[in-house]
């Protein structure tokens, strides 16, 4: 089993990297890619939300299929789907279309949904790493997940911004090329890591229903408030970040290079916080206080962005974005840890899976709400609305049953 370990690690790592890289290339450029078809906030929000909706619905099924039929075929099909979705998106934004045609918008939504359905590769590639790692080395192997995601978040905006200077659709074609390379590596190097004797039957339909999972944790008095806070945090955060580039484009006249640089700042700061700082900070301050500090930082960053009133002060945006990334890097792992600590070991899988479902649901609902608000109430409204929701999150976390005990332990 030692000989295939390196190609297996390479295949899993490339799959995880491609999952983050392709999305962080495409997402910041959506307002520029949509400019010919529908440059409004509502369409942008719906397009961003459609990707998350597909992931929300399909991810539990993809995980179950990989447990039943093996990791390799599921990863290959998902990466192939990513090639199809990205390729369709790239082709659609590259072709000339009549101004009155709704076909390109329809194709863009189909492409994003296909790519979202294929997003289950991250969970299955993580399962590959678990399959090939003994328990005492699993944490070190799982560090590859953070490295891959961090590289993807950093390289994606940089690559997208630089290539968009040549032609706005070009980054999507390059993302498609990365996905093709990923597929070739999977087909040629990735062995099956789940033995036949370890495979499971497909679960009941109810167990694949993401809403059923969510209902279980939200009605649990011990973690319900924290899980509601987790959902509201991602609802607010994914809402205003979905229209962030559109705001930069319309308010300051930024092009793709400057707009994607803001997301590059997010990637660098978030990677440093979650990869280097979060461990020592948790030991020193505790998860509960870190969550509240992070929420305050996100609110400050969120309100700073519309506070920059003129293009001459636009560099202050990067400070606000860095504060946002710092706060998010503190909140996400700390809030997950609070839920995890409150539950017994036997409830970990269900709870953490439910948190992922809540995150996906917030990522689906947030962008359309923010986009509609942007169009109807003005460009500042998504930021003000997000700040109000985040204040509610602070109230929920402060009043959770964990507050007192966690404070004492910290």
Name each region found by the language model.
Residues 59-70, 273-287, 374:
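Helix-to-loop junctions at the C-terminal end of transmembrane segments
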Residues 80-101, 297-311:
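C-terminal ends and interior cores of transmembrane alpha-helices
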């Amino acid at each position: 089993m030692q000989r295939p370990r390196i190609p297996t690690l390479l295949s899993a790592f490339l799959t995880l990297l491609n999952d983050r890289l392709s999305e962080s290339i495409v997402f910041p450029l959506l307002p520029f890619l949509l400019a010919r078809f529908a440059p409004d906030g509502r369409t942008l929000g719906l397009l961003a939300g459609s990707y998350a909706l597909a992931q929300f619905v399909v991810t539990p099924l993809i995980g179950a299929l990989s447990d039943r039929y093996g990791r390799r075929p599921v990863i290959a099909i998902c990466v192939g789907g990513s090639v199809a979705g990205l390729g369709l998106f790239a082709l659609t934004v590259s072709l000339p279309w009549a101004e009155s045609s709704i076909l390109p918008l329809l194709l863009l939504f189909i492409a994003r949904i296909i790519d979202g359905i294929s997003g289950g590769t991250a969970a299955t590639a993580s399962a590959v790493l678990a399959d090939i790692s003994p328990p005492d080395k699993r944490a070190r192997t799982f560090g590859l997940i953070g490295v891959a995601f961090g590289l993807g978040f950093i390289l994606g905006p940089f690559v997208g911004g630089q290539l968009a200077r040549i032609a706005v659709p070009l980054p999507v074609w390059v993302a498609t090329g990365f996905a093709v390379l990923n597929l070739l590596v999977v087909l040629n190097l990735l062995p099956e890591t789940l033995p036949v004797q370890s495979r499971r039957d497909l679960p009941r339909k109810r167990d694949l229903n993401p809403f059923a999972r969510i209902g279980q944790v939200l009605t649990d008095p011990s973690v319900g408030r924290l899980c509601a806070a987790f959902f509201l945090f991602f609802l607010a955060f994914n809402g205003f970040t979905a229209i962030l580039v559109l705001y930069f484009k319309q308010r300051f006249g930024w092009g793709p290079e400057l707009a994607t640089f803001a997301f590059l700042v997010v990637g660098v700061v978030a990677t440093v916080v979650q990869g280097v700082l979060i461990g020592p900070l948790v030991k020193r301050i505790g998860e509960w206080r870190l969550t509240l500090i992070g929420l305050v930082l996100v609110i400050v960053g969120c309100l700073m962005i519309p506070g920059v009133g003129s293009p001459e002060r636009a560099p202050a945006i990067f400070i606000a974005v860095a504060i946002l990334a710092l706060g998010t890097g503190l909140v996400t792992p700390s809030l997950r840890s609070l839920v995890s600590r409150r539950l017994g070991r036997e409830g970990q899988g269900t709870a953490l899976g439910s948190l992922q479902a809540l995150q996906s649901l917030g990522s689906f609902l947030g962008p359309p709400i923010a986009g509609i608000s942007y169009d109807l109430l003005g460009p500042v409204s998504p930021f003000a609305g997000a700040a109000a929701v985040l204040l509610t999150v602070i109230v929920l976390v402060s009043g959770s049953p964990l507050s007192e005990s966690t404070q004492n332990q910290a």
